[in-house]
């Protein structure tokens, strides 16, 4: 449900304890003062309630909702209202609405809204700090453990294996070269024996020649 101007005047009449004429004049004078100030480009600030001001809109292109045609809109000035901190706090429920007296007091709602805004981030910051503190040692331990194992055990074993394997290879290579050398020596000696065996064969024809001479 909404409240119109007549209903507002009735409520104001009861609160002021005056007649309807005075309440009507009060409402009209307040509205007239705000409209004239905003028209000039000034802003009307009511602490805790809000600010009435003028906003400038640049030229833009709009669309007609009925026809769908594009329409150029000239730059204009538009009245605007910015609600105050106490007004926002009361509507959102952050600040309790008093049963009696003014709903918005100067310097009361604003301080309460600031306290709520300061307390909420502080709690979040402390929780985040605690989580970071618990996670940090775990990460440090995880980084230190692999470093010790890698530094003590792994490189030593690999180094020993690396030193032993070349020694075995060298001894095997020496044995292979020794076997090859002996084979080569045997190969060089074999032709000498064959040559010695061939030499007596040349002498055999000489004996046959002497035998033939005796027969003659």
UniProtKB/Swiss-Prot annotation:
Residues 103-216 are annotated as: Degenerate repeats region. It is an enzyme of class 1 (oxidoreductase). Disulfide bonds: none annotated. Residues 115-216 have a biased composition (Basic residues). The modification N-acetylmethionine is found at residue 3. GO terms for molecular function: damaged DNA binding; DNA binding; DNA-binding transcription activator activity; double-stranded DNA binding; ferric iron binding; ferroxidase activity; structural constituent of chromatin; supercoiled DNA binding. The modification N6,N6,N6-trimethyllysine is found at residue 140. Its main location: cytoplasm. Probably acetylated by Eis in vivo. In vitro acetylated by Eis (strain H37Rv and H37Ra) on many more residues than those identified in vivo. Deacetylated in vitro by NAD-dependent protein deacylase (Rv1151c). Trimethylated on Lys-140 by human SUV39H1; trimethylation inhibits mycobacterial growth. SUV39H1 probably also trimethylates another residue. Signal peptide: none annotated. InterPro entries: Hist_DNA-bd (IPR000119), Histone-like_DNA-bd_CS (IPR020816), IHF-like_DNA-bd_dom_sf (IPR010992). The keyword Magnesium does not apply. GO terms for cellular component: cytosol; extracellular region; nucleoid; peptidoglycan-based cell wall; plasma membrane; protein-DNA complex. Residues 3-92 are annotated as: Bacterial histone-like domain. It is found in: Cytoplasm, Nucleoid; Secreted, Cell wall. Changing residue 140 to A: Significantly decreased trimethylation of HupB by host SUV39H1, increased bacterial survival in human macrophages, SUV39H1 no longer inhibits biofilm formation. One of its GO terms (biological process) is cellular response to iron ion starvation. The modification N6-acetyllysine is found at residues 5, 74, 88, 105, 118, 135, 148, 169. It catalyses: 4 Fe(2+) + O2 + 4 H(+) = 4 Fe(3+) + 2 H2O. A nucleoid-associated protein (NAP) that probably plays a role in chromosome compactation. Binds DNA non-specifically, with greater affinity for supercoiled than linear DNA, binds well to nicked DNA, gapped and cruciform DNA. Has a preference for A:T rich DNA. Required for activation of the mtbB operon. Binds the mtbB promoter in the presence of iron, binding is seen with as little as 25 uM Fe(2+) and increases with increasing Fe(2+). RNase E and HupB jointly contribute to cellular adaptation to changing growth conditions and survival during antibiotic treatment and in the host. Was identified as a high-confidence drug target. Oligomerizes. Interacts with topoisomerase 1 (topA). Interacts with Eis. Interacts with antigen 85 proteins (fbpA, fbpB, fbpC). The highly basic C-terminus confers greater specificity in DNA binding to all tested dsDNA. Residues 1-102 stimulate Top1 and physically interact with it. This is DNA-binding protein HupB. It comes from Mycobacterium tuberculosis (strain ATCC 25618 / H37Rv).
């Amino acid at each position: 449900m909404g409240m119109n101007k007549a209903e507002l005047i009735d409520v104001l009449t009861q609160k002021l304890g005056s007649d309807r004429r005075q309440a009507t004049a009060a409402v009209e004078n307040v509205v007239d003062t705000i409209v004239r100030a905003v028209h000039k480009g000034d802003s009307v600030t009511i602490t805790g309630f809000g600010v009435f001001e003028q906003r400038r809109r640049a030229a833009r292109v709009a669309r007609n909702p009925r026809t769908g045609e594009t329409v150029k809109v000239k730059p204009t000035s538009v009245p605007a209202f910015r609600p105050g901190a106490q007004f926002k706090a009361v509507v959102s429920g952050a600040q309790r609405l008093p049963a009696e007296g003014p709903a918005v007091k100067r310097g009361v709602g604003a301080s309460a809204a600031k306290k709520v805004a300061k307390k909420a981030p502080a709690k979040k910051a402390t929780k985040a700090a605690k989580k970071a503190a618990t996670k940090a040692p775990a990460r440090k331990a995880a980084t230190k453990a692999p470093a010790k194992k890698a530094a003590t055990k792994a490189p030593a074993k690999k180094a020993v294996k690396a030193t032993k394997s070349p020694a075995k290879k060298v001894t095997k290579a020496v044995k292979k070269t020794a076997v090859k050398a002996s084979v080569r020596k045997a190969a060089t000696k074999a032709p000498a024996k064959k040559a010695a065996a061939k030499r007596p064969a040349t002498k055999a024809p000489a004996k046959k020649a002497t035998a033939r001479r005796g027969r003659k």
